[in-house]
Amino acid sequence: MFGYNADAIVTPCEPGVVRRVLSWSDEMMMCEISFEKGAKGNFHHHPHEQITYVAEGSFSFTIDGETKTVNKGDSVYMPPNAEHGVTCLEGGKLVDVFHPKREDFLRK
């Protein structure tokens, strides 16, 4: 029921990117992704629905070929299997929610 920051699963991703798995259930998962300015989340796709909230900073998101800039307080929806990637324009943090949970994020 409660997710504690001290218990987060921390994983370095691409250069300048760190993922923290904060909380999950059988059906969903929440992660915090920290980015240094200029860092990229490489293009990928997955069968999960994803909603991303910009907690800090500014980012350029591309989803299925459409690119938009999003800033603190904005959000982004990625449907299942959408090809997407991100570039950090101003150092910041994203909060990702996945449905269903990302089993691959729980493996060490």
Model-derived features: positions:
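Ligand-binding loop in jelly-roll beta-barrel domains
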Residues: 80-104
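A short, N-terminal "cap"/entry segment at the start of jelly-roll beta-barrel domains
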Residues: 1-27, 107
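Histidine-centered metal-chelating micro-motifs
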Residues: 40-41, 60, 76, 80-85
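Glycine- and acidic-residue-biased ligand/ion/polar-headgroup-sensing regions
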Residues: 48-49, 53-59, 64
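A cytosolic small-molecule/anion-sensing beta-strand core signal
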Residues: 55-56, 71-72, 90
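Anionic, Ser/Thr-rich low-complexity intrinsically disordered regions
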Residues: 31, 61-63, 95-96, 103-107
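Conserved short histidine dyad/triad with adjacent acidic residue
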Residues: 31-45
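Short acidic-glycine-tyrosine-enriched beta hairpin
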Residues: 66-80
